[in-house]
Amino acid sequence: MPSPPYTLERTVVIQATPATVFGFLTDTPLWAAWWGAGSEIDARPGGQMKICYPGGTEAVGEVIEVTPPERLVFTYGYASGKMIPPGGSRVTIELEPLGAATRLRLTHELDNEPVREDHIQGWRYQLSLFANVVADAVNSGASGVVDAWYDAWADTDAASRQRTLSRLAAPALRFRDRYSNTDGIDDLVAHIAGAQRFMPGIRMQRRGEVRHCQGTVLADFVARSSDGQDRASGTTTREPRIAARVAAYSAHQYARATGWR
């Protein structure tokens, strides 16, 4: 099809590798996890795609180009023929590595400006939703990582604590709260030893489910003394970094003290 004259462009950074992100664009179950039940895509040139929106609206199109894991192009229109007829616009999705993450750039080419304006908010919403759907998969084991992180704070064996943190965290880990400012795992290991010395018997535990938004993980915690009393509470935030071995975390912890004793 000739290039339509009006262009809508959006970008979003997703905390996953291009290969992982591309899978959500080309695998029907993952495509449906983004768009909704009944949505499907045959990710090969000439293949058909369908998007099932709430309320019964359907978008349909034909796949034009598939270049794993970098580029997907398809036509886009509504089965009803209203606003955009089938084949009446073109969507290009390009993926670019950004460190351990991926920058997704979407270009939607349309025939008229009012329709372009009508789709800006829709793509803003859909790409944010997409980033979180991918993060759901990438962070599926986040609860175990968070629990191991808190366990390391109670480990009195420095060598064991070092091994655990090296497995969980990026080497350049930066830790910040009201009482500390550390850089690197060695610095944090020493800081934990100091915390154990001056606050003996205190143990942090996760409270509730781990939450995340577009790759940033949030976990509420309570710091509890050996007599079962809650001494502090707060929220730990971690930005995932994908590694070949495990999901590595650069940690920034912001504690809200409620009265150490």
Stretches with model-predicted labels:
Residues 81-133, 190-261:
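A beta-strand edge to alpha-helix "cap/lid" segment located at domain peripheries
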Residues 18, 37-52, 59-61, 160-215:
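A solvent-exposed, acidic/Ser-Thr-rich amphipathic alpha-helical stretch
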Residues 1-40, 142:
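Hydrophobic ligand-binding cavity/cleft-lining segments
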Residues 21-22, 31, 49, 63, ...:
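Hydrophobic pocket/interface hotspot
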Residues 132-144:
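Short, highly charged C-terminal tails/helix-capping segments
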Residues 67-72:
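Short, conserved beta-turn/loop elements at beta-strand boundaries and strand-helix junctions
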Residues 15-19, 141-168:
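Short acidic-aromatic low-complexity motifs
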